[in-house]
């Protein structure tokens, strides 16, 4: 039996004040079904960062994983762009 593909998101680090955990904001754009306007929606994910390598402002790729704590279900895959 095949396991489904894990979800992958790209977002910006907004907090790194916890140990081995970062908060990543992922922006989603979609067209409103009735009015047709492009709407921006932001969702924040708590992400496991094993080596504490991320800083606020970094652009990162995250992947879905097994539950690591009450709210952590994502892990860091790579840092795409470091903050200046």
Curated annotation (Swiss-Prot):
Write out the entry's keywords from A to Z.
Ribonucleoprotein, Ribosomal protein, RNA-binding, rRNA-binding
Q: Name one GO molecular function term.
A: structural constituent of ribosome
| InterPro entries cross-referenced by the UniProt entry | NA-bd_OB-fold, Ribosomal_uS17, Ribosomal_uS17_bact/chlr, Ribosomal_uS17_CS
* Stored Gene3D superfamilies: Nucleic acid-binding proteins (2.40.50.140)
**Keyword Ribonucleoprotein carried by entry:** yes
Q: Which GO terms describe its cellular component?
A: cytosolic small ribosomal subunit
Q: Which GO terms describe its biological process?
A: translation
Q: Which Pfam families match?
A: Ribosomal_S17
Q: Enumerate the HAMAP family for this protein.
A: Ribosomal_uS17_B
Task: Give the multimer and partner information.
Answer: Part of the 30S ribosomal subunit.
Q: Which family does it belong to?
A: Belongs to the universal ribosomal protein uS17 family.
What role does this protein play? Answer: One of the primary rRNA binding proteins, it binds specifically to the 5'-end of 16S ribosomal RNA.
Q: What name is this protein filed under?
A: Small ribosomal subunit protein uS17
What's the name of its gene?
Answer: rpsQ
